[in-house]
Amino acid sequence: MASTLSTTFTGLDFVNPFILASAPPTESKRKIMKAFEAGWGGVVTKTIGLHPVENVAGPKTIYQRTSETKPYVSRIKRPDTVSHSSWNWELISDQPLDLWLPDLEEIKSSYPDRMVIASIMAGAGNQEEMDNWKKLAKSVVDVGCDAIELNLSCPHMDRKDMGANVANDEEIIRSILQAVKSAVSVPIWVKLTPASSSLVDGAAAAYGAGAASISLCNTFPSLPLMDPETLKFEVEVDGLVTSGGLGGLAILHQALQRVSDISRAFPDKSISGIGGIRGFREAFNFIVHGAGNLQVCTAAMEEKGSGGVGIKLIQELKDDLRDYLDHKGHSSIEEFRGIARERIVEHSQVRRKSENYNGGFAISA
């Protein structure tokens, strides 16, 4: 049986399931074109908005590392260390909509077989903001974008009516989706915050209002570390810091839990998996928990010599997925997507010790 890397996700045909997430790797036409040349199946643009954006006057992203010989997390690049996580307090794109539009049109015309998903964000709570959602959506679709991702997940927005600040309000989720759906007919993905005690309820509201997919997980709210000698944070401006987003390999297990929660609650719905993918092993785990599309960020940003778009990474992901499909005799990822669902159970359903069972250990005489 011939295998294929191509997938159909939310009605869109992807040449492969691997796409770059909304982040610095997709912040410009130059980077997106380079990503498509390297082989990525799609991109989610860095979030586009209408309100003025001004980032902090200092490093916007740092990379944390750890090792076995010195088991603490630090941004210091010692020779014995490996990647642990990324931390950022970067806001959405500071490039205005009128500059994005011709770039998006050129990108799509240059790579018609690649999927361009525009990440957009506006506020909430009044008709003016609902109109802003509509304007953003219609503008990006008119220049050729294949789908829209609603950013309801950024953990450190400069406004309280945006990003993760509104993602716990199911009525706001519905109202934003209704506004956007009234303006465009392309698939709408909703990127929800993982920092929610009612994530399944939020997903239910989104799916119920017409979302084609949920994207999980964005970065987790977090703080950088303080050095015990200098008393400085590893990233700060004038000695001050604010909550930022933790991503990369450190959030993999939490991301899988949340994808699993949504997938088990809505097994017939689509999920785009994000959070800690550095290679096929991590991607595989998102697929078996129900994700039909895979977004990558930190690993691409960290790859040296790639301009932050993961040139070697996408080749490895495609090669390893193709090898796995051939080895297992699968025709596509759909043949094993979601197979872990039935094996995730309540704690009370896991077997306890008994006279004849000792948790896999030998029973002493």
Task: Identify the function of each model-found stretch.
Residues 33-38, 42, 125-272, 280-296, ...:
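Alpha/beta enzyme core
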Residues 23, 48, 153, 219, ...:
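Flexible loop residues that form catalytic
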Residues 14-28, 88-94, 117-132, 189-197, ...:
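Active-site mouth loops of central-metabolism enzymes
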Residues 69-170:
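Active-site beta->alpha loop and helix N-cap motifs at the rims of alpha/beta catalytic domains
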Residues 287-288, 294-365:
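C-terminal extensions of enzymes
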Residues 5-19, 59, 79-86, 107-123, ...:
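N-terminal small/glycine-rich loop or linker at the start of catalytic domains
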Residues 52-70, 223-244, 299-330:
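C-terminal helical cap(s) of enzyme catalytic domains, especially alpha/beta-barrels
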Residues 2-8, 28-111:
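Glycine-rich, positively charged N-terminal anion/phosphate-binding segment
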